[in-house]
Each structure stands twice: as structure tokens, then as C-alpha cells.
Amino acid sequence: MGIRKLNKFLQEKCPESITKRSLFQLKNKKLVIDASNMLYRLNVDGELIPMLYQTIITFKYYNIIPLFVFDGTPPEEKKEKLIERRKMRVEAAEQYASLMDDIETKNIAMNDTLRGVIDRLERTKTRLSMKLIHEAKYLLKSCGIPYIDAVNEADELCAFLVNSGVAWACVSEDMDLFAHGCQRIIRYFSVFQQNCVVYELSGILSKLKMKLADFRAMCVVCSNDYEKDGTMTVYDIWHEGLSKNELTIKDVDLFERIVEMFEIKDVGEKSEVDCATFVIEYKECNVELCRFVLEQNGFVFNNQ
């Protein structure tokens, strides 16, 4: 949903609960992966499959056991937001094409500011086609990496699996996981730098002296889904609302619907995952299928 300035707020208020770690420190850990979120980040210049393969190799090198969780059907509250995102992708693609044409035809010199604009447009215009998602699933399956499809949104199920003890943490850049109450979140997972940043929600709540329900309410009130004009930030809520023990709710019905959307108490009933018996573990590899998927994406193998 987008929570304005939440990350900056947490870094300033709770630095001791946010730690940079090497991937070696994740050895033997079981992690749930917000699949769509990671695939978007890996799909740089259309190189999704090579980047995903490199990520799989890294997981296996450190014996990190991942479970990729793919999105299911989004809730009604988010369908309008998805339409907006599709519109933004189209606009970004048009702006990107126009900008690149200007750079080429007008000999515009590249600088850091221009590169930043290009990078932002590239990220915004990126979309995952069903073909790419299916190819990613084929590669995961061939390499023995488990994956499941959530009934609704992946982040909800990811938080449920972490909080149920099935996984140690969730890998995602989606700040919604904090609103879901996910106890441990891994951001900035870097295959090339071999490190990541771990957020501990229990430490964050303790430092802020907040209950999860209050923290979730703060996230919702300053979210893009609730406050569309973009004026409310975490700082506003923290300094003006919570400090005075009062919080102004403009649209109570919308607020309650969004808060309920982030409660994960019934996700186990909607999921095929039985936390009492479910185990995240590597499956058997299918070398021929792996080779086929990679060859379809430009890999060349020496048959000798």
C-alpha cells in the first residue's frame, strides 16, 4: 500500500533493531520469499531468468532454504491501486521511450541526475508477464526450489508463515509486511554484495513502546491506500497523534476495512499450508528441465 517515510522513521527511531548482515549469517535459515516482489527487482533489462538463476545458486551456496510465495487474488480494497499501477507503468514506458529518443537524437550528455530519472522510469515501467512468471516457476522447480501460490496476496501468507515458526524471516521490499505484523523482515537482499538488512519487529515495537495494533493503525493512516492526498506521514502520526493519545480518523469505514485486511488471523484457514506439518526444504533437481529453461534464455552449454 505504500507507507510514507516508514523506513526512514524506523532507521532513525529503532537503529538497534535494524542490522546489516552477511548472507553467511543466514546459513541454514528457512526463508519465505515474496516472489513477485523479488522477481520485479531481478527483472533488470529483461534478464529475469539469469538473475533468478544467480540468486538460486547463492541460496544453495549458503544453504539458505527458500520458499517462494506467489500472489493469488488481490482483495477488493487493492484493485483500484492495481489499476493505478498499470496506468503508471504505461506512462513510465512512454516517458522512458521519449527520454531515450531525446538523448539519442539531441546528443544529451548523461549525468547522475539523468541516470537517476532513467533508473526510476525503468523500475516503474517494468512488469511481469504471465510467461515470465511461468518460466520463473519452471526454473525454481527444476532447481529443487519449493514454491506455492497464495490464495490472496503473498505478503499476507509470508507473514503468517514467519509468525507461525515455519520460516525464520520474509525477504521482501514491501513495507506492508510491517502492517501485517511479520516478526522478521529481510530487505536489500543483495546477491552481488552478499549481504542484506534484517528488521526485527519485536525490537521496533519495544523501542517505540507500541502494541502491534497501534503500530498497524499508524501504518494504515499514513498509507497511500487510506490517505490519497499524500499529506500524512509516519512522523505526523507519531508526533501529533500518538504523542497526544489521539488519532483523527477521516473515513472510519475505510480505515477499519484496511486494518482488517492486514490482520492475518484467518490466513491459515484460507491456505493449503498446514503449519503443523509443513516443512520448507529443497526438492529433487531436474537437470534437463533446468537446462531447457536456461537455454531458452540465452545460456549456452558445452556438450563435451
Describe each model-derived feature in a short phrase:
Residues 13-27, 31, 62, 193-304:
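Non-catalytic nucleic-acid-binding/docking modules located in mid-to-C-terminal regions
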Residues 142, 146, 164-167, 225:
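Short amphipathic alpha-helical interaction elements and helix-loop-helix interfaces
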Residues 153-157, 193-194:
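A short acidic, often aromatic-flanked loop/helix-cap motif at beta-alpha or helix-coil junctions
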Residues 158-188:
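Acidic, metal-binding active-site segment of PIN/NYN-like and related structure-specific nucleases
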Residues 2-13, 25-150, 157:
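Noncatalytic, basic helical substrate-engagement surface that gates or grips nucleic-acid strands
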